Amino acid sequence: MKALVTGFDPFGGDKVNPSLLAVGQLKKRIGEVVVHTAQLPTSYAHSAGVLRAAIEEVKPEIVLCVGQAGGRTELCLERVAINVQDARIRDNDGKQPIDKPVVKDGPAAHFATLPIKACVAEMRKAGLPAAVSNSAGTFVCNHIFYALMDIAQSHPIPMRGGFLHIPYVPEQAARLGGAPSMALDDIVRGIEIILEVSATRTSDVHTVEGRIS
């Protein structure tokens, strides 16, 4: 089984992006999964095209996109991507779309097709703070998550996909006055667990992961 795992380049003034650091440390094989990786630009205009090209080259059964969400305290598997671009800051092309769709006339939302609750349960068993998140935001992370699931719907090879938001790493938090962070090794282990679980499960567990807010 082949998996494609992507990370983003640094953005917003950061010198590193932990998603790219973590993806770069993944083993080439995790259990029965052959792992391929790709770097995506933090760009509304170009990220989906780079992702599509990587998918066409690799032809993966599993795609996991990973992105930084500074301020989060857990490894957050996203449940849903929405068809909205509403940028708080400019992307790396200097663009700041407001209230624009990811895909014109596309559905309002796409849901992850990885077993996100089962993955979260296994990460917690491994001692990693993890959660199902119900909002991927409206920046490039949500954009690429929506684009991924849109591609998956029409892809000739069956393909499941999802998005993982990760906290800062300690070197970033040290410059930001005590922002929450997570060790890079723990982030890498979380990604490995997601791939392991996704390779062995096609259905999710029926457990409560809802939140009031």
At which residue positions do the language-model features occur?
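N-terminal catalytic or cofactor-binding beta/alpha core of small enzyme domains
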Residues: 1-136, 149-158, 177-213
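Hydrophobic, aromatic-enriched interface-forming segments
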Residues: 142-149
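GST superfamily/GST-like fold recognition
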Residues: 162, 167-170
